[in-house]
């Protein structure tokens, strides 16, 4: 979880916030007709509202609390997905499809197999899939959609706060990053993944 928290802290910095949670006026997105302008690039309206939700949450709770909340949210969901796939309840979307550490969920999307998702996310992933170098960005959109569409995760953890979707770490797929460690951990055996205690943790 500390690995996730460090990645989330770095991601918040890239979104314009300093270590105290302050943000300069020039780093705030500007809502425009049909989208938002941020750092010289055009984004969807959804990004604007997620960014503002993050800003408001930091003002209300403080940046350290937001680090904790986002790390807790992603840790729980990613570990739960691993448990579900180890018990053959869902396809192994987090596992790698190749030596380049491309997750299966991304590989399947490149073949036209997308999880259920809202239309704005669908448009976003279609654009991203045109660029094979944007694996992490593709993974982030697909993972968010997968979490929203999965009834078990929804029942166990509820709906994610919208700002949390922005905070999946940029190094999530790096060598020795969280997904890499989750896929290759020796701390939990295959037998333990099927234990009632670990499955019970979901509930």
Residue ranges of each PLM-predicted region?
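Preference for the N-terminal adenyl/adenosyl cofactor-binding alpha/beta module
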Residues: 1-203
């Amino acid at each position: 979880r500390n690995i996730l928290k460090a990645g989330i802290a770095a991601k918040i910095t890239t979104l314009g916030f300093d270590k105290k949670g302050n943000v300069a006026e020039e780093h705030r997105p500007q809502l425009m007709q049909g989208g938002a302008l941020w750092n010289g690039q055009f984004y969807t309206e959804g990004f604007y509202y997620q960014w503002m939700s993050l800003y408001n949450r930091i003002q209300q709770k403080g940046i350290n609390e937001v680090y904790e909340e986002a790390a807790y949210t992603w840790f729980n969901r990613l570990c739960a997905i691993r448990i579900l796939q180890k018990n053959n309840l869902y396809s192994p979307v987090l596992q790698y499809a190749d030596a380049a550490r491309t997750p299966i969920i991304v590989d399947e999307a490149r073949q036209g197999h997308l999880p259920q998702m809202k239309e704005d996310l669908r448009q976003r992933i279609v654009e991203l899939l045109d660029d094979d170098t944007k694996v992490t960005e593709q993974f982030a959109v697909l993972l968010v959609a997968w979490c929203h569409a999965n009834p078990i995760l929804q029942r166990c953890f509820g709906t994610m706060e919208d700002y949390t979707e922005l905070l999946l770490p940029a190094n999530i797929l790096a060598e020795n990053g969280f997904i890499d460690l989750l896929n290759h951990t020796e701390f939990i055996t295959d037998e333990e993944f099927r234990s009632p205690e670990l499955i019970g943790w979901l509930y």
